[in-house]
Amino acid sequence: MSKNRNIIEGRILSFDKSPFNKDFDFSSLNVDKKRIFIIDGIIDSIEPVNFIHPEFQDIEVIDYGDHLISAGFVDAHVHYPQTAIIASWGKRLIDWLNIYTFPEEMRFKSLNYASEVAARYIDFYLSNGTTTMASYCTIHQESVDAFFEYAAY
């Protein structure tokens, strides 16, 4: 079976050591220009630009020039039903919930509305480099169905 192969070239954001250990000062950040060799959507290797990979002889290089390439961002706590009320003002939390949040979340019992917002929300996150999120839906099954249907798309 033929494998899908890609080569991406650009400035790769990486670390010499884990940035999560207590010796972070000794973990230097690199943005060197390199090539990423990908087989069936999985990174096979990251190599210097002059490296010739034997399995990628006839593959065109997608060169992003000096643009930065990094792993996707992770958002560990987001609420997709609040997309339409981002930056809505509230004097106190309970005011904000009663005036904006609860009425907006009730709209998610409509599958059409939930689907429209799910598409806008997921597209927005992906366009800004967020590839992983832990997102809340509403109490309505339609909000969950719309979210996961679009995410699977």
Model-based region annotation:
Residues 1-56:
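N-terminal metal-binding scaffold of metallo-dependent hydrolase/deaminase domains
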Residues 14, 76, 133:
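Short, electropositive, low-hydrophobicity segments enriched in small/polar residues
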Residues 15-16, 79, 138:
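Flexible loop residues that form catalytic
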Residues 45-48, 72-79, 106-116:
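Low-complexity, flexible helical/coil segments
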Residues 87-153:
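Alpha-helical scaffold segments that flank or form the walls of functional sites
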